[in-house]
């Protein structure tokens, strides 16, 4: 029977199995929702897994306050349309310190507003399992991470002390205070994600489609002028370099730390065609991935997504 399933249907079945397994095994799971394409697919799979019932766990967005405005609008729209139980957490310490990606840099901003914010939220609500939309093809540290990624009481990941995973057998045993991060999309590729979005008609943030947008090139990265806050941190010379270009985003994060790519892809079929030809990583536009060699693995060791 499995042999008759298409590649995408096999991936779908595997992901749904993982999601149901976690819901059955753990006392208090949560699904992390970053509003991006992978989160959209993961949420769609979770709704399928428990249809016609509602999700048996909440959805959580760790908000840095620097997401694209279109992402916030899309999030609120999805929550209303799907009737999601959404938890939003913003690190109050980061807010009190006025942490932002311009003044404090990408590494500190990510550590305080994302990593520490996530750890605060997990501790506050006592979650023992957290679904994430990471895929192994995205980045080398994610390539070696298990589907069930064990975290100690401080939410730290030890890549040298991972549990074996044989076929579809997962070890979910944790002691009090420990937890796991679960990655149901581990075996999907970026192309798989886009083909599934197309076939299933999954709604996504419009930023993924090419359009004329105001951008400025900084250190080889096209940064979109999303709101007035960025203008406060640009010199007059930099402001004079703001131009309109037809761009889209392959990955979405905090807008000052996420680069656009020039593109003509205005539809899902265009994007899929582009994916068949591209030879660059989707995360090439993520500034945080360039903080230093092994920066992503170090972030994950400290508790990052």
Curated annotation (Swiss-Prot):
It catalyses: sulfate + ATP + H(+) = adenosine 5'-phosphosulfate + diphosphate. Keywords: ATP-binding, Nucleotide-binding, Nucleotidyltransferase, Transferase. GO terms for molecular function: ATP binding; small molecule binding; sulfate adenylyltransferase (ATP) activity. InterPro entries: PAPS_reduct_dom, Rossmann-like_a/b/a_fold, SO4_adenylTrfase_ssu, Sulfate_adenylyltrnsfr_sub2. The keyword 4Fe-4S does not apply. One of its GO terms (biological process) is sulfate assimilation. It comes from the Bacteria. Its EC number is 2.7.7.4. Pathway: Sulfur metabolism; hydrogen sulfide biosynthesis; sulfite from sulfate: step 1/3. Transmembrane segments: none annotated. It is an enzyme of class 2 (transferase). CDD domains: Sulfate_adenylyltransferase_2. Pfam families: PAPS_reduct. With CysN forms the ATP sulfurylase (ATPS) that catalyzes the adenylation of sulfate producing adenosine 5'-phosphosulfate (APS) and diphosphate, the first enzymatic step in sulfur assimilation pathway. APS synthesis involves the formation of a high-energy phosphoric-sulfuric acid anhydride bond driven by GTP hydrolysis by CysN coupled to ATP hydrolysis by CysD. Heterodimer composed of CysD, the smaller subunit, and CysN. Belongs to the PAPS reductase family. CysD subfamily. This is Sulfate adenylyltransferase subunit 2.
